């Protein structure tokens, strides 16, 4: 397992997890994901982020193709979530860095995760605008709180024109390609939307505050902690896409979700879809039983109307439908309009039951 040189003296040393199908335990990643970590070879050899629990061996193996792990001088932690720092103890034990840089909030998270294990770690908290020289390269830190954790920050290297963006601009893509331009373009866009609408969406106000800062930087490459690295034209494309997704402007498309017992509600769902079609509105029908709730949320990335259907079951609705609605509500899409429908044998409460769970 070799390191991949993405720029002169800058390497990808992460790992690909082809078997990670439930991202964060709630969003499907059917082809797996990547845990990206990066290494800069300089007077102060610097590792940026680590990998998930159980994956330290892969990182250290790749790193070992460039230098010995104990030659790492600095470690930068952009984000303390365990899919990036769950291997921190093993990496620090192997590398023994002289300094570890992270945000103040990350330092608090680190203490919560590792307690007495970190009492001898040389951790230094940094804030927005702080910079360090590692030789030919300078690293500038920018806090991005609630994008998507309180401890989040990004690291910018002006000499290499690269932004190490942690979870921002990421996707769940597992494969041997490292760059966006090596991957099928339509799939990249779909995966970026899937990631944003299932992970980042509630923090869209923070995205809109952060994007002007990102646009002010001279960037030729964005290196996220998941998925593919953007370079050249794809840098502007992913920044523009994030702005569009964060703005959540109304889109002329509807998504109809439903569950059914004896196909009556299913027939109604298709009838509703036909009504949209007859009026020139693109629409998609999705069974809550057949589609994971993260797939439904991804479909809503291009829609601003949600219609929900369920038969009445025990004076309420079928559980798959309510599960999907609860998930959507937690992600707080801001422009959804729509309605509810249902079928029944003798009571018919289901449409009214949706009102308390409607994702407004």
For the regions a language model picked out, list residue spans one by one.
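Active-site metal-binding motif and surrounding structural segment of the metallo-beta-lactamase
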Residues: 43, 54-101
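Helix-loop-strand module that forms the ligand-binding subsite of alpha/beta enzymes
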Residues: 292-360
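Active-site neighborhood of phospho(di)ester-bond hydrolases with catalytic His/Asp-centered motifs
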Residues: 48-50, 72-80, 100-103, 163-166, ...
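Conserved beta-strand hairpin/beta-sheet module of binuclear metal-dependent hydrolase folds
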Residues: 3-65, 154-157, 161-165, 265
């Amino acid at each position: 397992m070799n390191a991949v040189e993405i720029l002169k003296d800058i390497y990808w040393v992460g790992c690909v997890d082809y078997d990670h199908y439930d991202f964060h335990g709630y969003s499907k990643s059917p082809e797996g994901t990547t845990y990206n970590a990066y290494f800069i070879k300089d007077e102060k050899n610097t590792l940026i982020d680590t990998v998930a629990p159980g994956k330290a061996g892969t990182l250290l193996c790749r790193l070992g193709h460039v230098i010995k792990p104990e030659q790492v001088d600095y470690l930068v932690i952009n984000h303390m979530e365990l899919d990036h720092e769950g291997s921190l103890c093993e990496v620090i034990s192997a590398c023994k860095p002289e300094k570890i840089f992270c945000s103040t909030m990350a330092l608090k998270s680190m203490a919560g995760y590792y307690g007495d294990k970190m009492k001898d770690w040389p951790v230094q908290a940094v804030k927005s605008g702080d910079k360090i020289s590692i030789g030919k390269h300078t690293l500038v830190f920018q806090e991005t709180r609630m994008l998507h954790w309180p401890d989040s920050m990004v690291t910018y290297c002006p000499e290499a024109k690269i932004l190490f963006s942690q979870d921002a601009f990421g996707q769940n893509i597992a494969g041997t390609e490292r760059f966006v331009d090596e991957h099928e373009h339509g799939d990249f866009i779909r995966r970026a939307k899937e990631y944003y609408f299932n992970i980042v969406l509630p923090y869209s106000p923070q995205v809109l505050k952060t994007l002007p800062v990102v646009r002010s930087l001279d960037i030729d490459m964005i290196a996220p902690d998941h998925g593919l690295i953007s370079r050249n034209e794809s840098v502007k494309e992913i920044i523009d896409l994030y702005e569009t997704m964060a703005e959540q402007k109304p889109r002329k498309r509807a998504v109809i979700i439903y569950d059914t017992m004896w196909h009556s509600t299913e027939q109604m769902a298709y009838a509703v879809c036909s009504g949209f079609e007859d009026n020139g509105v693109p629409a998609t029908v999705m069974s809550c039983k057949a589609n994971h709730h993260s797939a439904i949320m991804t479909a809503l990335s291009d829609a601003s109307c949600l219609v929900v259907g369920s038969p009445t079951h025990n004076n309420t609705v079928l559980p798959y439908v309510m599960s999907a609605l609860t998930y959507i509500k937690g992600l707080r899409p801001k422009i959804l309009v729509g309605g509810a429908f249902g079928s029944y044998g003798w009571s018919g409460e289901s449409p009214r039951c949706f009102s308390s769970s409607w994702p407004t």
